[in-house]
């Protein structure tokens, strides 16, 4: 099986390409990726657990907690079990929560116990009956709670969303000013694949001229080089955060316990 929830950035499947195309038409301030997990697991909602990628802003982190507290209020009132700050991190860029996050939104995963084994009703390991209605009701409740708290904070959400992109086009995000991809004839197909990927993700690029100095991915050292006719991806652009996440040579990792994928830097591909 192919997991489309790991294909947001790469868009190798037609379903992913159509989904991201629609996403880019709307560019939401809030995006929730609804899932189901093992039937014995209680409901999961934000905030996520570490590691968080360092491009995630303090506002994005803070508002995840604000949303989680609003959900908890409703779940506590109903006596529904839930957990937060466990299992699901915000690191790998191709999930349905991180991809929106790296594009300025508050991106979150919500997980309901059930899955294919849930059926119309099932008895879990605790001896409780979990019905399809229960599962739908939990997702319905977090949906309305998300809308409610987002509406209450609409002004701040829009302000911070605008700031995210204003910062991207004024100063850029990250320590590197630009990324250079050598446009060697022998790598023609690989370069074309990269440019196709950049286009899919709305990342701007151009052709270089002259010489410069920077980090060499192959040697791991700072070197002088010519970049005439090479591909140059400027870090100062609307998708600056996504550029940093996809191209930086080494992402910071504050916790070695991650959900799964930890390596993806495009220049090494």
Predicted features along the sequence, with ranges:
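Detector for the c-type heme attachment site
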Residues: 36
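Intrinsic-disorder/low-complexity accessory segments
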Residues: 6-7, 12, 18, 22, ...
């Amino acid at each position: 099986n192919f997991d489309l929830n790991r294909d947001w950035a790469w868009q190798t499947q037609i379903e992913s390409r159509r989904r991201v195309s629609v996403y880019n038409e709307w560019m939401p301030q809030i995006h929730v990726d609804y899932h189901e997990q093992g039937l014995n697991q209680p409901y999961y909602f934000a905030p996520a657990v570490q590691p968080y990628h360092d491009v995630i802003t303090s506002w994005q982190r803070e508002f995840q907690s604000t949303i989680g507290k609003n959900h908890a209020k409703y779940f506590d009132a109903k006596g529904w079990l839930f957990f937060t700050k466990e299992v699901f991190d915000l690191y790998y860029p191709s999930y349905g929560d991180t991809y929106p996050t790296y594009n300025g939104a508050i991106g979150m995963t919500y997980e309901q116990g059930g899955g294919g084994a849930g059926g119309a009703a099932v008895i879990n390991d605790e001896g409780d009956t979990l019905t399809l209605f229960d599962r739908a009701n939990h997702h319905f409740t977090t949906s309305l709670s998300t809308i409610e708290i987002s509406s209450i904070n609409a002004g701040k959400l829009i302000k911070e969303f605008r700031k995210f992109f204003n910062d991207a086009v004024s100063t850029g995000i990250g320590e590197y000013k630009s990324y250079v991809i050598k446009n060697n004839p022998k790598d023609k197909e690989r370069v074309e694949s990269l440019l196709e990927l950049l286009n899919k993700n709305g990342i701007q690029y151009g052709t270089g001229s002259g010489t410069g100095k920077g980090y060499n991915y192959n040697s791991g050292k700072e070197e002088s080089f010519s970049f005439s006719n090479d591909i140059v991806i400027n870090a100062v652009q609307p998708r600056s955060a996504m550029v940093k996440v996809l191209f930086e040579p080494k992402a910071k990792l504050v916790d070695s316990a991650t959900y799964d994928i930890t390596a993806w830097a495009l220049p090494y591909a």
